[in-house]
């Protein structure tokens, strides 16, 4: 008799995806982040669902409802901080996952990579709208500044902004629709992640060497289920330590003041995971130019498969590309720091240089490095 997991229509799908899936025998811990992102999404949906039971999406009571969750709801403070810091955890895993994809040439699986970029945009949109919901000072002014950027679009800009706001400023209508979108988007992300997996399983996983591994495959379970489980335990340990000991470390103190349209905070800035893009936006003095640079800073990822010039897929044996890759990571850290600083010298020029370097490495230097490495290999 056939085992039920191999015969039952539903179990069969799970079996092919997580149990009997042939996986390369040499994938490292950098391949753990896909499953960890799935865990992050589950944590966010679960904690978000419980928060939504007590939250009120009305400008008069949103701030109070968050205070009520923290003070009066059983373990409400814990659920709130798990959800707030869970977003940071999500983006840490997301950026590490993308970094691994760039380093090991996983972007050559074009469909999987492009769905991944769609997932990144969806996650960023969800996080931005979620940041508005507590209706603190930084929530309100962050929403005002970022949505206002759309007014830079020629001809339709102003109408578009007013349409998104549902009025002439960020107000009750904006908060209600942001809550609705913030609730539905994680489920869309989950569905898109399924498509991401579907495309990945069409080709099979890449591996650190960047060479075909069809001749040496092992079943996903038990090898990688237990390897992923170790990652889960480490991740949850670090996460819970953070939530229970430093819950407000990554938040903005301004968000503990209720939104006030008549009082602007001295420095308006988004959460830390958007600061690199915010720094690129601010480095261009022109409003429309800044918005284009902001979108391109993420959309440029879609060009990686087209700009791959090296004969080898992975950067494992490409020292020049490795140097450029780690320069890019350092550059992103500098941009993140600059995004949190006021717009004054010397931060302006540092941000502009870092922004130019960011695009130069991706669009120019990495493809040239690939060609140079091809020449070196022929010597």
Curated annotation (Swiss-Prot):
Record localization: Mitochondrion inner membrane
GO MF annotation list: metal ion binding; ubiquinol-cytochrome-c reductase activity
Note describing how the cofactor binds: Binds 2 heme b groups non-covalently.
Keyword Electron transport: yes
GO cellular component: mitochondrial inner membrane; respiratory chain complex III
Main location class: mitochondrion
Residues annotated as binding heme b b566: 97, 196
Misc remark: Heme 1 (or BL or b562) is low-potential and absorbs at about 562 nm, and heme 2 (or BH or b566) is high-potential and absorbs at about 566 nm.
Cofactors: heme b
Binding residues for a ubiquinone: 201
Membrane-crossing residue ranges in chain numbering: 33-53, 77-98, 113-133, 178-198, 226-246, 288-308, 320-340, 347-367
A GO BP annotation: mitochondrial electron transport, ubiquinol to cytochrome c
InterPro entries the UniProt entry points to: Cyt_b/b6_C, Cyt_b/b6_C_sf, Cyt_b/b6_N, Cytb/b6-like_sf, Cytochrome_b, Cytochrome_b_C_euk/bac, Cytochrome_b_N_euk/bac, Di-haem_cyt_TM
Keywords tagged on the record: Electron transport, Heme, Iron, Membrane, Metal-binding, Mitochondrion, Mitochondrion inner membrane, Respiratory chain, Transmembrane, Transmembrane helix, Transport, Ubiquinone
Membrane topology type: Multi-pass membrane protein
Subunit structure and binding partners: The cytochrome bc1 complex contains 11 subunits: 3 respiratory subunits (MT-CYB, CYC1 and UQCRFS1), 2 core proteins (UQCRC1 and UQCRC2) and 6 low-molecular weight proteins (UQCRH/QCR6, UQCRB/QCR7, UQCRQ/QCR8, UQCR10/QCR9, UQCR11/QCR10 and a cleavage product of UQCRFS1). This cytochrome bc1 complex then forms a dimer.
PANTHER family assigned to the protein according to its UniProt record, in alphabetical order: CYTOCHROME B
The family this protein is said to belong to: Belongs to the cytochrome b family.
Protein name (Swiss-Prot/TrEMBL): Cytochrome b
Organism: Chaetodipus goldmani
PROSITE patterns listed in its UniProt record: CYTB_CTER (PS51003), CYTB_NTER (PS51002)
Summary of the function given for this chain in its UniProt record: Component of the ubiquinol-cytochrome c reductase complex (complex III or cytochrome b-c1 complex) that is part of the mitochondrial respiratory chain. The b-c1 complex mediates electron transfer from ubiquinol to cytochrome c. Contributes to the generation of a proton gradient across the mitochondrial membrane that is then used for ATP synthesis.
Binding locations of heme b b562: 83, 182
């Amino acid at each position: 008799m056939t085992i039920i997991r191999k015969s039952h229509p539903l179990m069969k799908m799970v079996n092919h995806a997580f149990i009997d899936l042939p996986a390369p025998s040499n994938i490292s811990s950098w391949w753990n982040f896909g499953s960890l992102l799935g865990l992050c999404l589950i944590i966010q949906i679960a904690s978000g669902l419980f928060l939504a039971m007590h939250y009120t999406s009305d400008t008069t009571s949103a701030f109070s409802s968050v205070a009520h969750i923290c003070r009066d709801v059983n373990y409400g403070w814990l659920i709130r901080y798990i959800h707030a810091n869970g977003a940071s955890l999500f983006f840490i895993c997301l950026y590490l996952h993308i970094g691994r994809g760039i380093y090991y040439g996983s972007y050559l699986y074009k469909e999987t990579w492009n769905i991944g970029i769609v997932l990144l945009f969806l996650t960023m949109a969800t996080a931005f709208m979620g940041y508005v919901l507590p209706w603190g000072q930084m929530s309100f002014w962050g929403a005002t500044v970022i949505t206002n950027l759309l007014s830079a679009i020629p001809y339709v800009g102003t109408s578009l902004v007013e349409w998104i706001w549902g009025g002439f400023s960020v107000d009750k209508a904006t908060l209600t629709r942001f809550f609705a979108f913030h609730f539905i988007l994680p489920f869309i992300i989950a569905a898109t992640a399924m498509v991401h997996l579907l495309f990945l399983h069409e080709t099979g996983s890449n591996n650190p060497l960047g060479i075909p591994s069809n001749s040496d495959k092992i079943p996903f379970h038990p090898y990688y289920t237990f390897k992923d489980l170790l990652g889960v335990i480490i991740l949850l340990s670090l996460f819970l330590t953070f939530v229970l000991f430093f819950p407000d470390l990554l938040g903005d103190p301004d968000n503990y003041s209720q939104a006030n349209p008549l009082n602007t905070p001295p420095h308006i800035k988004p959460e830390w995971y958007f600061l690199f893009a915010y720094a690129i936006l601010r480095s261009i003095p022109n409003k429309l130019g800044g918005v284009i640079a902001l979108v391109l800073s993420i959309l440029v990822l879609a060009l990686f498969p087209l700009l791959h010039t090296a004969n080898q897929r992975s950067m494992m044996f490409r020292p020049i590309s490795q140097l450029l890759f780690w320069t890019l990571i350092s550059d992103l850290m500098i941009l993140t720091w600059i995004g949190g600083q006021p717009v004054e010298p010397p931060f302006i020029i540092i941000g502009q240089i870092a922004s130019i370097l960011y695009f130069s490495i991706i669009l120019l230097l990495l493809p040239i490095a690939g060609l140079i490495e091809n020449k070196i290999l022929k010597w």
